[in-house]
Amino acid sequence: MKTYYIDTLKDVKKIAKMLDDINSPINKNNATLLHLCSIMSSDTEPIEYLLDIGANPYQVDIFGLNSFDYAKRNKNPIAGLLIYNILK
């Protein structure tokens, strides 16, 4: 099984393209990728990219959490970036 990392913009673009090729609803996939970046990404570029291509930070997962919740729970500093991008 191949391991994918989501810490750089290049990696996130590669995964987003792969999810696009699977034929799943694109906004849902990008929102899931945004959830993962909210937890693990130490760079803001992947998050800005996902927001620019239409990832919905309000999309909730099966646990009822959205990207804001994940960023706050994991004390990831990108929570402020997410909120800023939504409000601008």
Question: Across the structure, where does each feature detected by a protein language model lie?
Answer:
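N-terminal cationic amphipathic segment used for targeting or macromolecule association
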Residues: 14, 22-23, 29, 53, ...
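Substrate-binding/catalytic groove segments of enzymes
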Residues: 44, 59-60
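Ankyrin-repeat boundary/"N-cap" motif
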Residues: 1-5, 25-37, 60-66
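Short, positively charged, low-complexity/disordered linker segments
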Residues: 31-54
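Ankyrin repeat domain, specifically the short helix-to-loop turn at the C-terminus of the second helix
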Residues: 14-22, 48-56, 84-88
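Leucine-rich solenoid repeat scaffolds
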Residues: 60-88
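Ankyrin repeat A-helix N-terminal signature
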Residues: 2-10, 36-43, 70-77
